[in-house]
Amino acid sequence: MTEAAEATFSADIQLIQRIIPHRYPFLLVDRVRDIVPNKSAVGIKCVTMNEPQFTGHFPGLPIFPGVQIIEAMAQTSAVLVGVSMDLADKGAKVYFMGIDGAKFRRKVVPGDVLEMTVTVKRGGGKVWKFEGRASVDGELAAEAEFSAMLDLPKG
């Protein structure tokens, strides 16, 4: 007997903006797919030359900053928490708390489609722990473990 397939969800940019407060120029996830509540999700970031960070990082050699790859993984995780706990339009915030073992494996440049796969290591309450891997065309670009805190509005 095979296990029943887990229900998966996706979040377009409208739902993402109903869950997380980030906006231009710091909204770093365009879509989240393959969301399995309380387990995992895949965020998508289409990297373009029009991004403001390329003005200074680096002139003539645009490279997407590694810290923003980590932030994109964190935003993907926040959307996963929001979908898992039905937080759209409820004023909840998911705050990035810490990061461990961040490693950068390849450059990310304009034209790349960055896929951030995040997996819950511990969650369901106020503090969540994740494992994240970002890749381009199946090639690992960055990885890290990180934690976040859920802040629900009072009242």
UniProtKB/Swiss-Prot annotation:
It catalyses: a (3R)-hydroxyacyl-[ACP] = a (2E)-enoyl-[ACP] + H2O. Pfam families: FabA (PF07977). GO terms for cellular component: cytoplasm; membrane. SUPFAM superfamilies: Thioesterase/thiol ester dehydrase-isomerase. GO terms for biological process: fatty acid biosynthetic process; lipid A biosynthetic process. Disulfide bonds: none annotated. The active site is at H57. Coiled coil: none annotated. NCBIfam families: fabZ (TIGR01750), PRK00006.1 (NF000582). PANTHER family: 3-HYDROXYACYL-[ACYL-CARRIER-PROTEIN] DEHYDRATASE. This is 3-hydroxyacyl-[acyl-carrier-protein] dehydratase FabZ. The gene is fabZ.
